[in-house]
Amino acid sequence: MSTLAEVYTIIEDAEQECRKGDFTNAKAKYQEAIEVLGPQNENLSQNKLSSDVTQAIDLLKQDITAKIQELELLIEKQSSEENNIGMVNNNMLIGSVILNNKSPINGISNARNWDNPAYQDTLSPINDPLLMSILNRLQFNLNNDIQLKTEGGKNSKNSEMKINLRLEQFKKELVLYEQKKFKEYGMKIDEITKENKKLANEIGRLRERWDSLVESAKQRRDKQKN
């Protein structure tokens, strides 16, 4: 049956997309398979098929529909993960800029660059409470240190030393923050990988079930002919 062969090909394409982690394309392929199996297809018109084959096709549709629903959940989860990873990459860029800036801080203007609108696009969006806490604490301490330096000019060296210590502490906190985030995202990626493997196993089960149903239908038809 050429139409079912086409469906098999589409399902195989969907499996490949799943293995690559492209759940959006996999979903589109399964939806295409549903359309091919739709009632508008003359080659699969129920009045031309035996009840066993018709039942097998209905079961196949149900299984494919279930896979589409699972993929929708995975797509939603994947989209959420990508947004979060994008946020972390943005935050890591901020940290890299600060870590790579080894020039001494002299004057209030340098410490208050974060208030400059030109830097807002770089810093936003920062929605992570932990990172916000680290950045706000650093900014608060730097502003205080620089103010003390300005008011007591004789102790400028001590003030600069304090500022450098603040930056060293910030580097350590940022490293711990990034390690924590990478661990969290690693766990989430493992979870998605397990879901992907589960989906691939269910696809294999679906194929075996379909083959069994078709074989059973053939045997019944042969018995009726004999």
UniProtKB/Swiss-Prot annotation:
One of its GO terms (molecular function) is identical protein binding. It is a peripheral membrane protein. Its main location: cytoplasm. It is found in: Cytoplasm; Preautophagosomal structure membrane. The keyword Membrane applies. Keywords: Acetylation, Autophagy, Coiled coil, Cytoplasm, Membrane. Residues 52-85, 182-209 form a coiled coil. Belongs to the ATG38 family. The N-terminal region (residues 2-83) bridges the coiled-coil I regions of ATG14 and VPS30 in the base of complex I. The C-terminal region (residues 123-226) is involved in interactions with the PI3-kinase complex I, localization to the PAS and homodimerization. This is PtdIns3K complex I subunit atg38. It comes from Saccharomyces cerevisiae (strain ATCC 204508 / S288c).
